[in-house]
Amino acid sequence: MKDVGLDDNLIFKYTHEFSGGQRQRIAIARSIILNPKFMILDEPTSALDRSIQIQVIDVLKRLQDKYELTYLFISHDLKVIRSMCDQIFVMSEGKLVEYGKADEVFENPQQEYTQKLLRAALKYSSN
């Protein structure tokens, strides 16, 4: 529990007493108990406030360093992807349309779909 920033005394609480961020950290703690080398994280920060998202991302980064974890990080949130990922795979309609190093894909997308996606995300984030 300490690895994910939670107190041990939380084990005495009921499920409905936890916030969304605490629930997410508990799910992460349950996953690392098995000492995995690879974890699939499907929208691990969705439905969380931005400040809680940042806390969860920090927990994931610390755990990745401490336990030498590899993540398959699935998300629609490009800010979170950019902060978490070394490599990016962009999919459209269930098909891979572009992949590469994160900086390269964000700074110089090759595919039209990726270019439109990044423009839309930039436009949305500036509003």
Model-found features: residue ranges?
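Short, glycine/charged-rich "phosphate-handling" switch motifs in NTP-dependent
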Residues: 87, 99
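Conserved ABC ATPase "signature" region
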Residues: 1-9, 118-119
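Conserved ABC ATPase signature
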Residues: 14-18, 22
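A short, surface-exposed alpha-helical micro-motif characterized by mixed small hydrophobic
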Residues: 81-83
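A short, proline-enriched helix->beta-strand linker immediately N-terminal to the Walker B motif
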Residues: 33-37
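Hydrophobic anchor residue at the start of the ABC signature
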Residues: 28, 56
